[in-house]
Design a protein with these regions (language model features):
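Residues in well-ordered beta-strands of folded domains
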Residues: 5, 70, 128-130
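Structural motif
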Residues: 7, 29-31, 133-136
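Amphipathic alpha-helical surface "interface" segments used
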Residues: 77-84, 126-134
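Conserved beta-strand segments that form the floor/walls of ligand-binding pockets within enzyme
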Residues: 11, 35, 128
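Single conserved hydrophobic/aromatic residue that forms the stacking wall/gate
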Residues: 1-12
Length: 150
């Protein structure tokens, strides 16, 4: 069985390593799409209970809702920290920024939560993060590849 869930959050970041205008501070209303798999439906005929995913929803909000994400190796870290100290931004420090890394980060967090709640019955098949209609990245569970017949 497979089930999708979508969530939107607004964040700001820059890609300081980029040679293009992407190295400038800019923001997105990110859309997260999570696909869950299971060995079968539960007693309520659900793959997962979305009402029970409050921890994941709160984590997404904490990480990506009106936040400024900065990479640990950003050469302007001191400047970004100054903005945080002046309460001008709500900073989150991550290993790297971008759709690919946000998909991976969210996949890891969601997988941990789903395993804690459901054990082996459910898992995260994939996480897609969209910046806009023309740019997205997907992190796929390579241990449990998506079965199109589910």
């Amino acid at each position: 069985h497979r089930l999708n869930r979508r969530q939107r959050q607004m964040c700001i970041r820059d890609r300081w390593r980029a040679d293009s205008h992407c190295n400038l501070i800019h923001g997105y209303a990110l859309q997260f799409e999570l696909t869950f798999g299971s060995t079968g439906l539960d007693e309520k005929n659900w793959v997962v209970d979305f009402g029970g995913l409050k921890e994941l929803k709160e984590w997404l909000k904490h990480m990506f809702d009106h936040t400024y994400l900065v990479a640990t190796d950003d050469p302007e870290m001191a400047t970004v920290q100054l903005l945080e100290e002046k309460n001008l931004i709500d900073m989150r420090v991550v290993d790297a920024v971008g759709c690919e890394r946000f998909a991976e980060l969210t996949f890891d967090k969601a997988s941990s939560i789903i395993e804690k709640l459901y054990g082996d019955r459910c898992w995260v098949e994939s996480v897609t993060v969209r910046e806009h209609e023309a740019n997205s990245a997907t992190c796929v569970n390579m241990e449990r590849p998506i079965n199109e017949e589910s």
